[in-house]
Amino acid sequence: MTQQLVRHITLGALGWDRDDPVYPEDLPVEWRLAYYANTRAAVWVPAETWLGGTTPDTAAWREDVNEGFRFVVALDERHADAPGRAAIAAAIGALGEQLAAVVATAEVHSAVLGDRHAGLRVDPAAVWRGVAVPAAEVRLGIVPADRLDSPRAMREVLEAFAAAATVPAPCLFVDGPLGLLEDLDTLGRLMGVC
């Protein structure tokens, strides 16, 4: 008898720092992460976050979330030659044990982080995006909002990701309105996968 992995999909968003109907109109911008983290356990930090000259205060991020909250950080080829590589590496390092993964090619990871966090590196090609991934381990996925336009579509995405994942607790991130997360989470709990 083959034993299946027990799956509990953690749902999160591709970024939190944006205008979104989920946030109260009078919520200060600097409180968005804390507000988001009240209902979510993970966030994908997009590659654009690390560009623009000012490195984010990730120590403040850690203060805004609970100990169980996790950050998935994306880096791309733009970071390999960025003048602020050392500051980016320090900011990522400041996430400490709350850093769940660094999504980057080996070359970019090495250029920005050296050998730090090598065990957390996930190749971008290993991120599930709705189709089969030619990777030994699938623990992260991203789905665009237009793939979640009905309860049936949401169910199909959750089933496909659960089938593709190779770890007991994979993370699926939504690229779209934060309100979709609540609907997806409700359906996932009914299905027994979230």
For each of these PLM feature ranges, what is it?
Residues 1-194:
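Residues lining hydrophobic/aromatic ligand-binding pockets adjacent to catalytic sites
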